[in-house]
């Protein structure tokens, strides 16, 4: 998209404000709102902002940063506030000397995309975004209660939530994001939105937009949408399974018609790389304390480091489709992650597998959830970290994933995770009160 096209859209749509969007290291979408006149005057050189108050960015003595709009991401928001139309554009973050900011999560993914392209690959991804829709109280605060007791693919006649999902799909289509499906998920009040796959970078941009639209539509209907991985005990948590493939030109590099399973060496090496780095990856793809309440046996979440052709109890599943649709599904990520950092780390792990020809173990087609510990030991099946603390310790030992994050983000990321863990470790929970108060 050219600046001339954007100028025409601004005039035709009577856009009054433009939101410059970027993402902090926690994955939180930030924005600076400016007028179209300021945007058209400043887009090329960048718009200055104070980076010292953004989580994981810079200290107060080096606070000046610049937002440079990525013009192809310009879109008019399909809702108004007080009748005024706004547009948004996603931005890259730059330092005052004109260099990409090392702490910008989007830059870390761009860097890994460039590495893949140097190897001759274009990486594609498509995530499945799961979330809960909850009621709110008179103060507008979310209430941790179910709105419905529906299950997987259930139809809820005349349900307000059905209207929310439709409005989400319509809004995303207006913003240029193709929605392939929306449906009720396994847990009560849990839902999923699937959108068309694209390159890793464009998909990460789209995922941030999808989360914004989901939350906005829920608010308009008087509800709260949460991407918390495990808000309720005893039911499935919300994951973000990621389907991914590598292409060379218009050919899927993961497909080999001469292989008995139709799978190329490159796919196997890519799988081998992810499995090798899976423990460290967990810190990035499952970055909250609550993430590890989801990663437990019995709730369809992966726990064991393995791969399979079709078996959903494995960490990596290869769906049955072949040809251009050949892909792997990485099942551990959850929607609390910073998707730019998660994609950068996953891509780094997979490319490490290809570069170093890391052979994965044999695929496991048994139900791993039903295996004994002796059987898992016999097959050398290890487990993902059981807590954020364990995952961060694994991350500290993994140079490939550290390099993908960059030293700046790695240090800030670990610092934030360890602070959360320390606070959580001293916090007295309701479970403890219920269990021990009468001692």
Swiss-Prot record:
Residues 13-98 form the GS beta-grasp domain. Binds 2 Mg(2+) ions per subunit. Its cofactor is Mg(2+). One of its GO terms (cellular component) is cytoplasm. Its main location: cytoplasm. Pfam families: Gln-synt_C, Gln-synt_N. The keyword ATP-binding applies. One of its GO terms (molecular function) is ATP binding. GO terms for biological process: glutamine biosynthetic process. ATP binds at residues 180, 243-245, 312, 317, 324. Its EC number is 6.3.1.2. PROSITE patterns: GLNA_1, GLNA_ATP, GS_BETA_GRASP, GS_CATALYTIC. This is Glutamine synthetase.
């Amino acid at each position: 998209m050219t600046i001339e096209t954007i100028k025409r859209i601004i005039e035709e749509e009577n856009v009054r404000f433009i939101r410059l969007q970027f993402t902090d290291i926690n994955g939180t979408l930030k924005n600076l709102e400016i007028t179209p006149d300021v945007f058209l005057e400043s887009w090329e050189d960048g718009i200055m902002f104070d980076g010292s108050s953004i989580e994981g960015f810079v200290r107060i003595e080096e606070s000046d940063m610049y937002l440079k709009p990525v013009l192809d991401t310009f879109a008019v928001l399909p809702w108004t506030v007080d009748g005024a139309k706004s547009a948004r554009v996603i931005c890259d973050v730059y330092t005052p000397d004109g260099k990409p900011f090392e702490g910008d999560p989007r830059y870390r993914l761009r860097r890994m995309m460039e590495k893949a392209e140097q190897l001759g690959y274009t990486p594609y991804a498509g995530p499945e975004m799961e979330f809960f829709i909850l009621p709110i109280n008179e103060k507008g605060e979310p209430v941790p209660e179910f709105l419905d007791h529906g299950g997987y693919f259930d139809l809820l006649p005349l349900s307000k939530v059905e209207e929310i999902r439709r409005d989400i799909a319509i809004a995303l289509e207006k913003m240029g994001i193709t929605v392939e499906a929306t449906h009720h998920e396994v847990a009560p009040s849990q839902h999923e939105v699937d959108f068309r796959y694209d390159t890793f970078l464009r998909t990460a941009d789209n995922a941030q937009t999808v989360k914004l639209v989901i939350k906005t539509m829920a608010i308009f209907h008087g509800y709260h949408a949460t991407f918390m991985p495990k808000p309720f005990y005893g039911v499935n948590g919300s994951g973000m399974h990621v389907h991914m493939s590598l292409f060379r030109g218009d050919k899927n590099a993961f497909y080999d018609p001469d292989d008995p399973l139709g799978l190329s060496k490159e796919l196997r090496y890519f799988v081998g790389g992810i499995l090798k780095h899976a423990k460290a990856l967990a810190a990035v793809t499952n970055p909250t304390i609550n993430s590890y309440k989801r990663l437990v046996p019995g709730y369809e979440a992966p726990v064991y480091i393995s791969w399979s052709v079709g078996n959903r109890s494995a960490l990596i599943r290869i769906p049955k489709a072949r040809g251009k649709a050949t892909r792997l599904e990485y099942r551990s990520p959850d929607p609390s992650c910073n998707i730019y950092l998660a994609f950068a780390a996953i891509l780094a792990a997979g490319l490490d597998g290809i570069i170093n020809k890391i052979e994965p173990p044999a695929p496991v087609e048994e139900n791993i959830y039903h295996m004994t510990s002796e059987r898992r030991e016999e097959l050398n099946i290890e487990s993902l970290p059981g807590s954020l603390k364990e995952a961060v310790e694994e991350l500290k030992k993994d140079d490939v994933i550290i390099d993908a994050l960059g030293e700046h983000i790695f240090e800030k990321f670990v610092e934030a995770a360890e602070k959360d863990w320390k606070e959580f470790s001293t916090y007295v929970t309701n479970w403890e009160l219920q269990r021990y108060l009468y001692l």
